[in-house]
A protein has these predicted regions:
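N-terminal binding-site loop/beta-alpha segment at the start of enzyme catalytic domains
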Residues: 1-83, 149, 217
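Short acidic capping loops at alpha-helix termini that bridge into adjacent secondary structure
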Residues: 14-15, 80-83, 87, 121-125, ...
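Acidic (Asp/Glu)-rich catalytic clusters
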Residues: 49, 73-84, 115-119, 148, ...
Length: 258
């Protein structure tokens, strides 16, 4: 495996990362098509044996069971210092006040829950899953900075923001001397190329690494077009039809891309 640096950091990561949204208890919420622990573990082990060291999950995936399954597998199959664990927060993980978002309280609470589920005392990359417009950006950024200083987080990242909003966050971090976002996890593939307009040029200019989510367009680019709805996931993944034109409405020009 030829490792690369994440953005302009000194962190070595495999160019292929394993997204663990697919791993989790299907009885514990989104996504309902996730693989249980017995099915997930061989895939995680194969990734490690292949030299992949970069694993990405989130607190909301299968209500935390993705973090639990990934954490147990990594403890069994790898040394902690050899892997890079990334997770995220922002979306609802429980009902009631402060069960979601990027307030200082939510951030301080959710990092501890994620560390417990992952079975580690630090996360390599802690990402905001989306921005939280009900919380002042300064509150969010300072709380994230404090996690780095406390040793619970090594690096900070963001995901799925408008370029102007991400630029504002980077400016505030620089101006205040706070730990900066070193990565942007954005939606980018052959069917979704909007990020080429502003976000990717911004990341190149700022030295921010890009991590792609849905590189295979939630399976649409992974198999023959007529088989695109042939899997349990594809037949139950309504979010895919929100991101992309429904398969039944695709034009011949669209199909030719695949």
């Amino acid at each position: 495996m030829q490792y690369i640096k994440l953005g302009t950091t000194g962190l070595d990561v495999s160019p292929v990362a394993i997204g663990a949204m697919t791993y989790g208890d299907p009885g514990r919420g989104h996504p309902v098509w996730s693989l249980g622990e017995d099915e997930s573990r061989p895939l995680i082990k194969h990734a490690i044996d292949s030299g992949i060291n970069f694993f990405d999950t989130a607190n909301m995936y299968s209500q935390g069971s993705s973090e639990e399954i990934l954490g147990r597998a990594l403890r069994d199959f790898a040394q902690r210092d050899d892997v890079v664990i990334a997770t995220k927060l922002r979306h609802p993980v429980r009902s009631g006040p402060n069960g979601k978002g990027l307030s200082r309280k939510a951030i301080m609470t959710e990092i501890d829950h994620s560390l417990r589920r992952l079975g580690t005392d630090y996360v390599d990359l802690y990402q905001i899953h989306r921005n939280d417009h009900s919380t002042p950006l300064e509150e969010t950024l300072e709380a994230l900075h404090d996690l780095v200083k406390a040793g619970k987080v090594r690096y900070l990242g963001a995901s799925s923001m408008p370029a102007w909003e991400f630029a504002k966050a980077l400016h505030l971090q620089r101006a205040e001397g706070w730990a900066r976002f070193v990565s942007m996890q954005d939606h980018y593939n052959l069917l979704a190329r909007e990020e080429e307009r502003e976000m990717i040029p911004l990341c190149l200019d700022e030295g921010v690494g890009t991590i792609v989510w849905s590189p295979l367009a939630r399976g649409r680019l992974a198999r023959a077009w007529d088989d695109a709805k042939a899997t349990t996931r594809s037949s139950n993944d309504g979010f895919a039809d929100m991101l992309y034109t429904p398969l039944t409405e695709q034009s011949e020009d669209r199909k030719s891309v695949v």
